[in-house]
Amino acid sequence: MNIINIEHIAKAYGEKVLFEDGSLGVDNRDKIGIVGVNGTGKSTLLKLIAGTEEADSGTITIANHIRVSYLAQQFDSQTHTRLLDYVTNGTTDPLVIVEARKLLKRLGLPDEQQELSKLSGGQKKRAALVRTLIEPADVLLLDEPTNHLDSFMIEWLEQYLQGYKGCILLVTHDRY
């Protein structure tokens, strides 16, 4: 059963055409890796599905009650936001907070009160991963999830994704 339907989309930036009459159906258990060189529309496709950009024409439909979590290649690192507030998106749900604390510790970010502005690039990427993974989602949209990660974190992420039961669309330049 398709949970995402992309039908006849077109997207261009000025003269640069990325998609012209593109269509794709995504099943609830699909694991799709999108590999390619810069400027070919990989990140744009995820942005279109996530709803952060609009196609010039065509439709993208996500089935009812499908929860989507999106890890952008460039993420907002609000400078004075504390780590726990960032990864939980300010929720007060105790279950989400407990899960966030576990995942922060597992990914080497135990100081939940630290400001994002004080984190290194790799730590910010790990914080963005925690934010993406803590709440249940049926679909993970992951744009360059291994950028700024060391080999141990990449290995952890690979294991996590191998055990993930939902749909994954992953964009990368690497063939790992």
Feature locations, PLM:
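ABC ATP-binding cassette signature C-motif
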Residues: M1-Y176
